[in-house]
Amino acid sequence: TEGLVLRQTKYDEWDKILTIFTRNNGKVQAIAKGARRPKGSLVAGTQVFSYSDLLLYKGRNLYQVNQADIIESFFSLRAYATHIIELIDAGSVEEVPNTKLFDLSIKALKVLSKLNKDYKKLLVAFELKYISFIGYRPHIRSCVVCNNELHNKIRFSIEHGGAICENC
C-alpha cells in the first residue's frame, strides 16, 4: 500500500516504530525491524517525509513493514512539510481510511517540491482543503453576516465561521 511516513520512534537497537498515513488503511502504527541498520533494505523507505510503496502485515498490536520502496522523498522540504505532516497526523484517525486527505497530502507535497517560492500560498490552500476534509468547512462564498457577495477586501472571522465583507 502507498504510505507517507509521519513519525518515527527508535525501538530496540535496530528497529523503529512508525506512524504511517496510508491510502487504504488510514493512519497506522507499524514496526520496521532492522530499519535503523545502515545497510538495511528498509532505511530509505521508512524515513519521515518518505512517500513509499509498503508491504504491511497486520500483527496483534502493530503492523509490520516487510518491504518499503521509496516513491518520493520530501525530506528537503522539511520545514514546510513538517507543517503538512503534523496536520495530517492530528486530523487522521487510526485505521480509518481518508483517501481524499491522502491524495491531497501527496499532491501538496509534490507541488511544494516543485515550487521556488510562494510556499505560504500553497500551505494556506492546503489548510483550507484540509479543514474541509476533516469536517470543518468555513463559509467563504459570501459574507457570513449579511450574505452579500465578497469583493477584494475581506476578513476572516473565526467567531462567525467564515468571510466577512468590508461593509460589516
Q: PLM features: residue spans?
A:
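Non-catalytic alpha-helical scaffolds and adjoining flexible linkers that form interface surfaces
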Residues: 1-168
